[in-house]
A protein has these predicted regions:
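Binuclear metal-dependent hydrolase catalytic cores
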Residues: 1-151
Length: 151
């Protein structure tokens, strides 16, 4: 029996941390840490539906810009999970770019970002391309038994 998940390091042991996990029979993937992901082909980057960020050091978060670049112009929702402060960090990255041409895109790219604090609460926000990635706050919720994602 083949495993349902296939994990692989994106870089060698001296490169930025990033673990790419493909799901068998589905064209979707998970990413654990978002270091340099330039070694991934675009088709693999475009499959990423969930990214889990351990902390915001540059070697764990540098790849966000390439993820963004590969997904702009596609209908996609990407769920991003990480520590406190992640919503602000993602928001700042998205605000660093000019989005004056968003009306030309028929598709909408959405980042649903959840930051988890030490007490197990998850604060969430949504950033949509159609809204020039303005932050839309979402409800804070308690995580049952520390479960971050149940898909």
């Amino acid at each position: 029996m083949r495993p349902l998940l296939h994990a692989s390091l994106v870089n060698d042991r001296y490169g930025d941390p990033a673990v790419y996990v493909e799901t068998l029979f589905e064209k979707q993937a998970l990413l654990f840490d978002l270091g340099d992901i330039s070694a991934l082909p675009p088709r693999k980057i475009q499959r990423i539906e969930q990214a889990f960020i351990s902390h915001a050091h540059i070697d764990h978060f540098f790849g966000f810009d390439l993820l963004l670049r590969m997904l702009v112009g596609r209908d996609k929702i990407v769920h991003v999970f990480g520590p406190e402060g992640l919503i602000d960090r993602v928001g700042h990255k998205l605000k660093a770019y000019q989005w004056n041409l968003v009306d030309r895109f028929l598709c909408d790219l959405i980042f649903d970002v959840s930051e988890i604090d030490a007490s197990g609460l998850a604060r969430a926000a949504r950033f949509r391309l159609k809204n020039a990635f303005s932050e839309e706050k979402r409800e804070t919720e308690a995580l049952p038994d520390g479960l971050v994602c149940d898909e």
